[in-house]
Curated annotation (Swiss-Prot):
Gene Ontology terms: biological process: glutaminyl-tRNAGln biosynthesis via transamidation; translation
SMART domains on file: GatB_Yqey (SM00845)
Identification of the protein by name: Aspartyl/glutamyl-tRNA(Asn/Gln) amidotransferase subunit B
Quaternary data: Heterotrimer of A, B and C subunits.
The protein's role, per its UniProt record: Allows the formation of correctly charged Asn-tRNA(Asn) or Gln-tRNA(Gln) through the transamidation of misacylated Asp-tRNA(Asn) or Glu-tRNA(Gln) in organisms which lack either or both of asparaginyl-tRNA or glutaminyl-tRNA synthetases. The reaction takes place in the presence of glutamine and ATP through an activated phospho-Asp-tRNA(Asn) or phospho-Glu-tRNA(Gln).
Source organism, top-level taxon: Bacteria
Listed SUPFAM superfamilies: GatB/YqeY motif, Glutamine synthetase/guanido kinase
Biological classification of the source: Bacteria, Pseudomonadati, Pseudomonadota, Gammaproteobacteria, Pseudomonadales
Molecular function (Gene Ontology), one example: asparaginyl-tRNA synthase (glutamine-hydrolyzing) activity
Pfam families documented for this protein: GatB_N (PF02934), GatB_Yqey (PF02637)
Reaction(s) the record says it catalyses: L-glutamyl-tRNA(Gln) + L-glutamine + ATP + H2O = L-glutaminyl-tRNA(Gln) + L-glutamate + ADP + phosphate + H(+); L-aspartyl-tRNA(Asn) + L-glutamine + ATP + H2O = L-asparaginyl-tRNA(Asn) + L-glutamate + ADP + phosphate + 2 H(+)
Signal peptide residues on this chain, from the entry's feature table: none
Amino acid sequence: MQWEVVIGLEIHTQLATQSKIFSGSATTFGSEPNTQASLVDLGMPGVLPVLNQEAVRMAVMFGLAIDAEIGQHNVFARKNYFYPDLPKGYQISQMELPIVGKGYLDIPLEDGTIKRVGVTRAHLEEDAGKSLHEEFNGATGIDLNRAGTPLLEIVSEPDMRSAKEAVAYVKTIHALVRYLGICDGNMAEGSLRCDCNVSVRPKGQAEYGTRCEIKNVNSFRFIEKAINTEVRRQIELIEDGGKVIQQTRLYDPNKDETRAMRSKEEANDYRYFPDPDLLPVVIEDSFLNDIRATLPELPPQKRERFQAQFGLSVYDASVLASSREQADYFEKVVSIAGDAKLAANWVMVELGSLLNKQGLEIDEAPVTAEQLGGMLLRIKDNTISGKIAKTVFEAMASGEGSADEIIEKRGLKQVTDSGAISAVLDEMLAANAEQVKQYRAADEAKRGKMFGFFVGQAMKASKGKANPQQVNELLKSKLEG
């Protein structure tokens, strides 16, 4: 039997406010336990929450960016459940009237196509505290620094049909919230966490299968692995005659398996009701218009512009537009070098590889956009070849200066004098007389393969400095002669 995978995601984004959503406590990551917890965060009697307007502004900004309905009358509700790191015994969230309603995201896929994924809603809520198990020898410590940190929970429609589509969706959200400046997107620190709702059904069946939720997955790689692992588990279970039970599960990356955490709750299990301590939030048109006027050019628009203006593929444009800093870097390189496709290749491949090796973000790149643009100019005017450019790039990354300084200092200027190249070729061909003889006796198919050998020998003899185009032209003439 053929199976279809159905995936919906809930993404918790920690909003980049300076203080918590209902108190004035700071939200700095990594502070000493319980040093950023006020009486409001601790749920002490007699204290009242006060809504942080900046959190509202950020939520509205996100809603406008995904072309969503904005709940201009939205209500906070109490979500009642017991957990040791939830001091009030309830979490302030939103249920029936969220701040952001239906919207959508267009996500770029690996095959160059664009898929539209619906967003059901996005609502504001407070984060819970954190349970600490390892430091207390069989006991559990509670750190309430995180309690009350503002979250925007983004709930998708079950529109994704593979783990790769799910990862593409999360990457699109990740890029968007960073563009907007509403979340730093640091998954390692928990700023962006994902719950994956996964089910399977026979191909062609309209009814959804029983879903399981995988909680708190915090990396793109683990999202893909967790979903694929859970899909395999469900299919094997059904094919063995079993039945999928609706559960909340955890993914164990060390064992590459999901395991049951608890039975999956429904909304009525939490006994939601409007929070009597918080008035309904009324959002005026003027507030919306002010926020709309501050929206930057967003990844989808930037991607489309890169395609139209620079002739880039959907994939290349999507990668380059995936972060604001990378897009700015690329455009600066293009403004200097004047060749978008060459710039895209160097930014994505050579610079990307360098940053990955050194564990750096693009705004920490050891090669500036001005330096890279200057080097690409030297490729375009034939001062250096593409191969020599890699040597120049490595030298720039090591702090040896600009491309022009390195080319001059190391004597890397490309040889374009036809006479000098011809002399190198004559010497190389004389040293490979037997291969020349074989080439001339060969048919066209074999000649094509052998020609590459001679080009390689010529570039080796010139120490990579000979102009490749001139080498090809002169070499062909000499071999055919």
